[in-house]
Design a protein with these regions (language model features):
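Compositionally biased, intrinsically disordered/low-complexity regions enriched for serine, proline
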Residues: 3, 18-19, 32, 44
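Bacterial N-terminal signal peptides
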Residues: 10-19
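Bacterial N-terminal signal peptides that target proteins for export
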Residues: 1-10
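GH16 jelly-roll
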Residues: 26-233
């Protein structure tokens, strides 16, 4: 991953939700240029003119606590999600050089608290403003899945700051809604508008020309400078 200058916090999570967000007007078709599932040939190389300032290739036996915090939260804390976020190893672990975030069905009770999952972030460890953020992921599929890779303001109150959401800001690098489309991911920006009311910009939707995002690994990228934010898949 490439990031420059402190300010933002990276968050990586997988959610099990049934909500469907607003539609996006700007859709881009994605055609694979190389086999994204080939681990040996897909090592990310910093582009010319960029310096690598932080990365995690998940080569250790366990999730590195110096890089990631396992955020513990009750079910329904953020989006009415049915799972609670735990610090259990079974919900987030390393397997064959990959970080696996797993939702586990733990109860036949309908609704809240029938799943556990993980919510990993870099709060209090690493934060960046401007730069390039890159992750290579293979997504789940099906109704109820909502994996996401996004950034929140380092000052957000859920991580010990003094600023509530959406005043803290949010940049969604990748969100996937299994209830809507297994071949599409979306990017978005959330912020506080007049009277601190939640506002958002439906910035981008990426759709595969063939197959699903669950079929193989894909590279999700966001570049942020003083003038614009650019997403790519």
């Amino acid at each position: 991953m490439l990031k420059l200058n402190p300010f933002r916090t990276i968050l990586l999570t997988i959610l099990c939700l049934s909500a469907i967000p607003p539609g996006f007007a700007d859709e881009q078709k994605v055609k694979l240029e190389y086999p994204a599932s080939n681990l040996e040939s897909d090592d990310y190389l910093a582009p010319a003119g960029w310096n690598l300032v932080w990365s995690d290739e998940f080569t250790a036996d366990v999730v590195d606590p110096d890089n990631w915090t396992r955020q513990v939260e009750p079910a329904g804390r953020f989006n009415g999600e049915w799972q609670r976020y735990t610090d259990n190893v079974e919900n987030a672990y390393i397997d064959n050089g990959c970080l696996v975030i797993k939702a586990i069905h733990t109860s036949d009770h309908h609704g809240m608290n029938q799943y556990t999952s993980a919510r990993l972030n870099t709060a209090g460890k690493f934060a960046w403003k401007h730069g390039k953020v890159v992750a290579r992921m293979q997504l789940p599929y099906g109704a109820g899945t909502w994996p996401a890779f996004w950034m929140l303001g380092a000052n957000i109150d859920e991580n010990g700051g003094d600023t509530p959401w959406p005043q803290s800001g949010e940049i969604d690098i990748m969100e996937f809604y299994g209830a809507k489309d297994n071949a599409a991911v979306e990017a978005n920006i959330h912020f506080a508008g007049a009277n601190n009311q939640h506002q958002h910009m439906g910035a981008k939707k990426f759709r595969l020309e063939e197959g699903w995002f669950a079929d193989a690994f894909h590279v999700f990228e966001m570049e942020w400078n003083e003038e614009m934010i650019t997403w790519s898949v």
